[in-house]
Amino acid sequence: MVFFPEEVVEHILGFLASHRDRNAVSLVCREWYRVERLSRRSVLVRNCYAARPERVHARFPGLRSLSVKGRPRFVPAGWGAAARPWVAACVAACPGLEELRLKRMVVTDGCLKLLACSFPNLKSLVLVGCQGFSTDGLATVATNCRFMKELDLQESLVEDRDSRWLGCFPKPSTLLESLNFSCLTGEVNSPALEILVARSPNLRSLRLNRSVPLDVLARILCRRPRLVDLCTGSFVRGNIVGAYAGLFNSFQHCSLLKSLSGFWDATSLFIPVIAPVCKNLTCLNLSSAPMVRSAYLIEFICQCKKLQQLWVLDHIGDEGLKIVASSCIQLQELRVFPANANARASTVTEEGLVAISAGCNKLQSVLYFCQRMTNSALITVAKNCPRFTSFRLCVLDPGSADAVTGQPLDEGYGAIVQSCKGLRRLCLSGLLTDTVFLYIGMYAERLEMLSVAFAGDTDDGMTYVLNGCKNLKKLEIRDSPFGDSALLAGMHQYEAMRSLWLSSCNVTLGGCKSLAASMANLNIEVMNRAASINEADNANDAKKVKKLYIYRTVAGPRGDAPEFISTF
C-alpha cells in the first residue's frame, strides 16, 4: 500500500470545503485522522450538547472558525443552550479564533464582553436566532473587535437599551463588509449610522431595521452605491416626499445590487422607486410587505428576469404565481408564506405550485403554505421539477385530503420522493396514512431531514422511515399515533442520526426507559409541565410523554437541564 507524506495529505485536504467531506476523510486511517484534525480550521457542531467544548478544542487545536447550533425549533423557553461554556473554552484553548457563529443559543452581555476582550482580532460574529443580550453587549464588541468584517444578528432577540453601539466601531475607518441589525426593534441613531456607513468603504451587505427612515436610506445608498445585499428600512418614516426622488436616483446607481429585502411598512406607492435595480436582482424577499397590493408585486417581480430566490406572501395569489412562472425561469428557490399567520385560509392553491413547476424547471427548493392540495398536482410537480433537494408543503388545515378526490395525499408525496432522487429535506402535511411513509422509506434514499404532523395510522409508518432512510439525520414528528414499538424499532438508526423530536404522540415513559437502557450514547429528554419525573417510580411507565427530544452525544447527560426536563 502506498502512503502519502503528511504534507501531501494536508495539501489535498485543503481542497475539501465541506464539513461532511472533512469528517469522511478523517475515518480513512489513523494517519489521515491525525493530519485532518491538526489542519482543520473550521468546525461545525450541530448540537451544543453533542460534545463538550473542551473535547472539540482538544481534537482541533488549530481551529479559527467555530459554528455551534443550540436549541431545536420546538423546545419550550428556558430549555438551555448557553453560549458561555463555548466562549470560555475558546478563550482557554483557541487564542487564534477569528469567526464565531451561534444559532439559537443564549448569549449574555457578559458572554459578549468576554468574547470581545479575549479576541480583539475577531473578524466575524454571527448570532442567528439568539437571545439574552442587549445593545450594551454589541457596543462592547464594536469597541474591542477592531478588525470586525461581519456582524450579523439575524432573527435574534436583542434588548434595545440605546443605539450608541453604532458609534463604537473603530475610527477613522472600519473593515466592515457585512452588517445586519434588521432584528432590532428599537430606535436607531441615524446620524451615527450614516457616519458608520461613510467610514466603511468595504461594506457590501447592509440589513437595516424598520426604524431607519426613508431619507436616511436614500443618503446611505448615495454614499454606498456598490452594495450587493440590502435590507431596506421603513417606508413610512422620515421625509418621505423629499426622499422619494432621492431614493429613485440612488437606486439607479446601485448596479451591483443582487439581493433585496425589508420593505418594512411599504405600500404600493413605493414599488416604482425600486424599479431601477430589478434587472440585476437574483434574491428578492417580499415577505415583510403585506400592504403592497398583489398587482404591484407582480409587476415588480416580472421585471426581475435573473431572479433565483423569491420569498413572497400568499396574497400574490395563484394568478400572480402563474405570471412569476412565465417571467422568472431561472428561479431555484420559492417560499410562499401566509400573509395572516392566524388564518386558516390562503389565496394560493395547488394551481400556483403547478404553474411554478411548469415554468421554473430549475427549481430546487420550495416552502409553500396553501389552502388546499391534490395528488394530481403533486404528481405533476414531481415530473416538472426532479431537481428538488428541499420540498416543504404546509396545507393550512393539517388534516386536509385531496381537494378533488377526497383521498389521502399519499400518492402525491410518493411521486415527489420517487422522482426527486436528490431530495434531502421533506416536510409533509395533509391527510396521510402509513402508505406515504412506506414510499419515503423505499425511495427517499438521500433524505436527511423529515418533518411530519397529524400523519400515519400505526407504528408501521415510523418504522418504514427508520428502516428505509439510511441517511436520515433529523426526524420531527408531531401529533401522530406512533408509540413505543416504533420508537424502539429505530434503535439501529439512532446512532447515525443527530436527533429525534416527538410531541403529542403515543410514546410512554416506559418506552423511553427501555431505549435509554439499550443506548448509552443517547440523551433522552422528556419535557413535562410539572417538575422532573422520578425515574425509579415504575408507576409512571404507562404515562404518555408530551414532548420528547433524543440526540446522540459523547458528552453524557448535560448538567444545566431545567426542572421541566427529565433525562434518561
Swiss-Prot record:
Residues marked Interaction with auxin-responsive proteins (site): E155, F369, R478
Any GO molecular function: auxin binding
Disulfide bond residue pairs: none
Cross-referenced InterPro entries: COI1_F-box, Leu-rich_rpt_Cys-con_subtyp, LRR_dom_sf, Transp_inhibit
Region annotation Interaction with auxin-responsive proteins: where it falls in the sequence: 338-343, 394-398, 453-454
Signal peptide region: none
Pathway membership, UniProt: Protein modification; protein ubiquitination
Domain F-box per the UniProt entry, residue ranges: 1-45
Primary localization class, coarse: nucleus
One record GO biological process: protein ubiquitination
Pfam families membership: F-box_5, Transp_inhibit
Quaternary structure note: Part of a SCF (SKP1-cullin-F-box) protein ligase complex. May interact with auxin and auxin-responsive proteins.
Domain remark in the UniProt entry: The F-box is necessary for the interaction with SKP1.
Record's miscellaneous remark: The myo-inositol hexakisphosphate acts as a structural cofactor.
Name of the protein described by the UniProt record: Transport inhibitor response 1-like protein Os11g0515500
Source organism: Oryza sativa subsp. japonica (Rice)
